[in-house]
Amino acid sequence: MRYIFILALCALMGCEEKEVIEPLAITPSGWPEAIFKNKSRKSLSETFAVHCAKLGATIVEESETRVKCDENISEGVKSWGRAFLCTGHSSDIHAYIQFNLIKRGADTHVKVLNWMQLQIPGGQIRRKDYNTLYYYNDAQAYLYKIGRQPV
């Protein structure tokens, strides 16, 4: 009788196994990264700035070594972020994506960082990195799409 109850419970709950997500690549830093053969930092910087603009993000910084964008996030995500990062007394919350570009001979090594941050009273910055496999795979797939080589 006990086994029938367990089987019935499993049937009602949907004994479906959760999909296991595998990373697209294992990188030295643990963040999405790639090497672009024979590409200058300047051309890649422009590519990443255009990508940010297409996402509707505000470009905070653009140089040959870094492109940093402030992503537009919904009020719901902002509320969740405030609750997760601190009390209700804080500055507006921001979600950033940053492309770091490092010259290696004729090649450029790119590492992508993504995080949420806010400033609490007293000036302290609280930051939470986006480090889920969903984010990681999306960013790594983007690097693959625009012509990267594995690290």
Give the ranges of each region predicted by the language model.
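Ser/Thr-rich, low-complexity intrinsically disordered terminal regions
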Residues: 16-151
